[in-house]
Amino acid sequence: MELNDRTIGQWLEHWAQTTPDKEYLVYSDRDLRFTWKEFNERVDKMAKGLLAIGVEQGTHVGIWATNVPDWLTFLYAGAKLGAVLVTVNTNYKQHELEFLVDDADIHTLCITEGVFDGNYVDMVYTMLPELRES
């Protein structure tokens, strides 16, 4: 097997340039469709946002989300910046999240609202009440 030296971000750029109008990502349950170019633009926008809040190469970024379009966007945006992706189990309770954030040295936590009996936003507000005002 031959390896190459392109990063995930470089592959995304490559396909966005060579097949910009070809459909890349479909979330049929949400009626969302992205071409390579559209998805790359979405990723670049997210990467700029992450960069603006201090995410850079080597920064640990947690993703606490279900299978939603933003999960993949965060993955690629972090990869373009050289960040370290830390996936968070969607079933975690607050004490498990607190341990993981500390143990994995998570700088930035990207979240969705939550699933089943857990509200991710409320758990984070309980851990860091000052975020409610920011």
What are these regions (language model features)?
Residues T19-D21, Q57, D105:
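Residue-level preference for short coil/turn positions at secondary-structure junctions
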Residues M1-L3, E38, V86-V88:
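Short, flexible loop segments at the rims of nucleotide/cofactor-binding pockets, characterized by
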Residues L3-Y24, E41:
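A short N-terminal helical cap/helix-turn-helix that marks the beginning
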Residues L81-S134:
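Structural core segment of the AMP-binding/adenylate-forming
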Residues Y24-V68, L72-Y76, K93-E98:
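Conserved AMP-binding/adenylate-forming core of the ANL superfamily
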Residues L12, T73-F74, V124:
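Aromatic/hydrophobic pocket-lining residues that form π-stacking "cages" and hydrophobic walls in ligand
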Residues H14, T18, K45-G49, E130:
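Solvent-exposed, charged/polar functional surfaces in cytosolic regulatory/catalytic domains
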